[in-house]
Amino acid sequence: MSDQPPPYTPLPLLSSFPPNPYPDQTPDPASTPTLVLPNPAFPNKRKRTGFRRKLPSGSPAAPVAVAASPSAQPPPRASAADDIIVINREPTAEAVTALTAGFPADSLTDEEIEAGVVSDVGGIEQVNYILIRNHLLTRWRETFNSWLAKESFATLIPPHCDHLLNAAYSFLVSHGHINFGVAPAIKERIPKEPTRHNTVIVVGAGLAGLAAARQLVAFGFKVVVLEGRKRCGGRVYTKKMEGGGRSAAGDLGGSVLTGTFGNPLGIVAKQLGLPMHKIRDKCPLYRPDGSPVDPEVDKKVEGTFNKLLDKSSLLRASMGDVAMDVSLGAALETLRQTDGDLSTDQEMNLFNWHLANLEYANAGLLSKLSLAFWDQDDPYDMVGDHCFLPGGNGRLVQSLAENVPIVYERTVHTIRYGGDGVQVVVNGGQVYEGDMALCTVPLGVLKNGGVKFVPELPQRKLDSIKRLGFGLLNKVAMLFPHVFWSTDLDTFGHLTEDPSHRGEFFLFYSYATVAGGPLLMALVAGEAAHNFETTPPTDAVSSVLKILRGIYEPQGIEVPDPLQSVCTRWGTDSFSLGSYSHVAVGASGDDYDILAESVGDGRLFFAGEATTRRYPATMHGAFISGLREAANITLHANARAAKSKVEKGPSTNTQACAALLMDLFRQPDLEFGSFSVIFGGQASDPKSPAILKVELGGPRKKGATEGGKADQHHSNKLLFQQLQSHFNQQQQLYVYTLLSRQQAMELREVRGGDEMRLHYLCEKLGVKLVGRKGLGPGADAVIASIKAERNSSRTKTRPSKLKIGIPKSKS
């Protein structure tokens, strides 16, 4: 089944608008305003000078004209035009704004439908809701430095649509589409103290983690962010370089805002008052000997490259599902041999340069990219200029991290999650407990098993982690005494003769206009990026200087030695293990969705660029995913609170439940050491519920120690020290937990005494021991069912049954 996006069409919503909302004004078809925006179906990855996937373009190809048609008719309903509200005179322009913000201009998103924003999907109510939603989005984009108050729209919205205004406003705020960012008016709304009892642990202080944490703090949650590095930002890292009285700020990771129209990071930059430098289209290429590439040859080869990409699209369409098992590289090589028309060495070198650029755009080898889905996100490219941020993207990171509680140098190695909350274990054994956790670690770390999940993640999520690709891009940043390269361009490229080295310093970024100093960045992509990981920095810098001197010294321009150089090693960075994600052979866009799914009944959530199907491998994708998960966490917290409120009704008698539990444990179904278990459900079902009681303190029971080996394991884990200390106290303490029949049977088989069983229970099974009150309403239902089953069994005559495990002592 093909995963290709449907053909792009003009906004069908316009057919729902009344023919003329202003009957006293007759529109002139010739003067009807037409909005032109780039066709989202055009594959931008093939262009020359972009960051990751989104590349700057001079004039958009295949423009889509969006205009309000004077002959458009309302839905087939009597007096429909009278029912459709009129907010302003430019509904079409506002529909385009919604489109650039990631909304369908004429329909609801799945999230809006799930939120129940309208009672009649597809009716007039939906049309009015969309008009209100689009208007709110447009107003927010115009007034991003102010808090957008719902009350300011009261006079615009008819009273019978107040519920739609409430629904649209609530949805847009809670999902981070409006009233987000770092403007003073937004920050003033953040509560000084938490207003909720829920604690959320955010793992990772990259853009996803910071976006989520900032939203959650604004929503009133208790939040703590755990970051393994000494800095925030993750794969967005602005390095200050200094030497010889010069200084400059260079982005060693994410560096380009890819499309500013609709990009939420563009809004954050505007809130900070930061000017954005549009990356200019000019990108001259130089041959291996340093001479300029013939413009006519350049044009011919670029046309051939684009033609082969078009043919690869036709090829995958004809192959159907088989295309999922074929790489883009294999398809392009086959097509090159049959339709390439590349006859000279210069043409082949140019073609290989374009292949290197494609590998750069996807952070993956072409031999690994899926022919079927490598460009599945192209329809969602952000519209607008591609820009550098003066001073680096670290300025965005620092503003987002302001007043967010971040604990640095805390490397997370275990995340336990269950029905009663989460535990996050960091280096040194320190444990952070919370109600929910958000994991934002890069896909490379997940692939490498850098974080252990207890219980293990669902198999479908593990499979998606394995299928998706995580590639590599490296850079060499060089601060020079002065600018010796052309100042009328932001990029230039260099060709290589060896195809296996085609990505080696193939593209240069000039940061002289935005870094505060003469800074030049050389990019290393594809196979060369992997080889670069083990290249000595001095050798790398020497190779770059050789290229630069080959280009400029024949022009009579001296190339000085750099004052400072930095080589990245993202592939061996333990906190990233790569650069960004791509759709590998065998994977699809569905895998991004699966990675985004929460687990543990709304206890553990996931964010990051590899969890967004629409915007993978981008900075704004990471940021948007953080806003998304802040909304999901809030929804689950609200649902859990509502459920708890219902279940904790006046009929609940805590003392009666406690007494009943004590009575049931007088005849446990299973007993070993200081552990006893009562079972609910059917004995044949290994997943049936059970309640475990652990007796801490008091006299030891038979089986409490085995083989005399328990002492050597005592206190190995900081997590268990407090529990284990109770064994040496005089008073008795009972703690409980819910688990399955199968888990209880596994626990019985653990050797090494009660200490090892405690270790297995908490470390392997990931459960949390609590007092009677901590069991919660779920356990009350199990207790009641066990009592009912036992009462029923007493009415029947049957032989006495032996208990499994160590029998109780006879009196």
Swiss-Prot record:
SUPFAM superfamilies: FAD-linked reductases, C-terminal domain (SSF54373), FAD/NAD(P)-binding domain (SSF51905), Homeodomain-like (SSF46689). Residues 88-189 form the SWIRM domain. Its EC number is 1.-.-.-. Its cofactor is FAD. One of its GO terms (biological process) is spermine catabolic process. GO terms for molecular function: flavin adenine dinucleotide binding; oxidoreductase activity; spermine oxidase activity. Residues 56-71 have a biased composition (Low complexity). The keyword Calcium does not apply. Residues 1-79, 790-811 are annotated as: Disordered. Residues 44-55 have a biased composition (Basic residues). InterPro entries: Amino_oxidase, FAD/NAD-bd_sf, Flavin_monoamine_oxidase, Homeodomain-like_sf, SWIRM, WH-like_DNA-bd_sf. Keywords: Chromatin regulator, FAD, Flavoprotein, Oxidoreductase. The keyword Transmembrane helix does not apply. Residues 1-10 have a biased composition (Pro residues). Gene3D superfamilies: 3.90.660.10, FAD/NAD(P)-binding domain (3.50.50.60), Winged helix-like DNA-binding domain superfamily/Winged helix DNA-binding domain (1.10.10.10). FAD binds at residues 227, 229, 235, 609. Probable histone demethylase. PANTHER family: FLAVIN MONOAMINE OXIDASE (PTHR10742), PROTEIN FLOWERING LOCUS D (PTHR10742:SF260). Belongs to the flavin monoamine oxidase family. This is Lysine-specific histone demethylase 1 homolog 3.
